Design a protein with these regions (language model features):
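Surface-exposed, low-hydrophobicity beta-strand/loop segments enriched in small/polar/acidic residues
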Residues: 1-146
């Protein structure tokens, strides 16, 4: 069975936390998640999310599109958890990643203070010995945290 985005890539060191979802928001499994100024979960993008608040990966889909802030919660992988996400472009093994405008992981190419890094690209499924670079649309393993 092939890995799917939002699945956990390793069974140890797993950290999961629930966050209240922002009003009129849908969070999709396997996509990067950030917290807005009110502390509610929203889709992370290149302009939404801060290192101080963290960037996470949703492990379930939650539809709060017709709800108020906090009506629903989403469970997210946090900390140093290894999780499958979708590459939003080419990423080299070991590079730090950030969210793109589709909440996918892309290579973080500028200095740390200028971008919201969420983790590091480790490889594809079953590539512990000789990982390869990722291409747009690949399902990849990211170790969250810096």
């Amino acid at each position: 069975m092939a890995a799917a985005i939002g699945q956990l890539a390793r069974s140890t060191g797993i950290e999961i936390q629930s966050f209240n979802v922002a009003a009129s928001t849908t969070i999709t499994k396997g996509k990067l998640v950030a917290l807005n100024a009110s502390g509610h979960a929203v889709a992370a993008t290149s302009s939404v999310g801060t290192v101080a608040r963290g960037v996470f990966v949703a492990i379930e889909t939650v539809d709060n599109s017709s709800g108020s802030a906090g009506d629903k919660e989403v469970r997210c992988a946090i900390g140093n958890t290894y999780v499958y996400v979708e590459a939003g472009g080419a990423v080299k093994v070991g590079e730090t990643v950030k969210a793109d405008n589709n909440s996918d992981a892309v290579a973080a190419t500028t200095i740390f203070a200028a971008e919201t890094h969420c983790g590091r690209y480790i490889g594809h499924e079953n590539e512990e010995a000789d990982p390869t670079d990722a291409a747009d649309g690949d399902v990849i393993i990211v170790r969250l945290g810096l």
